[in-house]
């Protein structure tokens, strides 16, 4: 039963934008091999991907954050879990619950609901929301809900895009680092990590523009398959240049100004706090 005051992932069906994530997916679920391929590109990106540097930095930062959590992570919630590409970064003994919205095409979530979050107070030691929190309609209430379902001393790990395209007809948020930190201001051990800077953003957006050309190559007569080596080579060159520029940026950049692809925030619910 949905709580009367429950926060939802997105507007109700009556208010849902025409091009919301749910409507763009269509009605047919992805085939298992498609889900596996998508999971691989998110967990083990290759230089032949246009978004290689972006995903690589996100995975590296996420792996480091999860490794520092230490023992005691038994129950994990993965919000907007998608293909669940990061489950292997968690302790092998952890019980992981995947949550996704109705109509998602992946078919790997244990719980499917529009409610954010349909769980009792203090249910989890770790709550993850990787590349999905920007869809939550009320971010402050979303953070409060994450805190509610965490046990005292539990951790939240949330990542959001910063330099990325958005859908003009869908509800999405963009956050700066200080904005994210402010959302978690009543938590402990709050840290915001930038997943890449200007160089990674440049390489990813340049690759994205090139990928638009790849997807416009007609699929008939195997033309897209025949063109794939050409585009793979272009992505390798773009990612190589981006990697060199990123190393230079990290070495010489001294300004407080930044332009990351992504932001990753980690925070701890105070251990002495009682469930509200």
Model-derived features: positions:
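Conserved N-terminal segment of class I S-adenosyl-L-methionine
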Residues: 1-117, 126-128, 258-264, 270-276
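GHKL-family ATP-binding catalytic core of two-component histidine kinases
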Residues: 118-120, 137, 176
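A short glycine-rich, Lys/Arg-flanked "PGG" loop and its adjoining helix->strand segment in the class I
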Residues: 140-152
């Amino acid at each position: 039963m949905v709580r009367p005051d429950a926060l939802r992932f997105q507007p109700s069906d009556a208010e849902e934008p025409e091009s919301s994530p749910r409507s763009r997916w269509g009605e047919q679920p992805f085939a298992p091999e498609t889900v596996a391929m998508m999971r691989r590109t998110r967990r083990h990106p290759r230089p032949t991907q246009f978004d290689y540097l972006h995903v690589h930095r996100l995975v590296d930062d996420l792996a480091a954050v999860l490794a520092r959590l230490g023992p005691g992570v038994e129950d994990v919630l993965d919000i907007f879990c998608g293909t669940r590409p990061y489950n292997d970064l968690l302790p092998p003994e952890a019980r992981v619950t995947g949550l996704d919205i109705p109509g998602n095409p992946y078919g790997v979530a244990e719980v499917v609901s529009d409610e954010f979050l349909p769980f009792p107070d203090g249910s989890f030691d770790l709550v993850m929301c990787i590349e999905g929190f920007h869809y939550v309609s009320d971010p402050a209430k979303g953070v409060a809900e994450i805190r509610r379902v965490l046990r005292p001393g539990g951790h939240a790990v949330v990542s959001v895009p910063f330099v990325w395209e958005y859908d003009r007809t869908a509800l999405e948020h963009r956050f700066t680092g200080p904005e994210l930190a402010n959302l978690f201001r009543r938590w402990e051990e709050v840290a915001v990590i930038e997943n890449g800077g200007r160089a990674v953003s440049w390489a990813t957006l340049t690759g994205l523009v090139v990928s638009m050309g790849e997807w416009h190559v007609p699929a008939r007569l195997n033309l897209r398959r025949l063109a794939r080596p050409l585009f793979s080579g272009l992505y390798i060159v773009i990612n190589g240049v981006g990697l060199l520029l990123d190393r230079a940026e990290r070495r010489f950049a001294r300004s407080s100004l930044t332009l990351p692809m992504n932001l990753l925030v980690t925070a701890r619910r105070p251990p002495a706090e009682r469930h509200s």
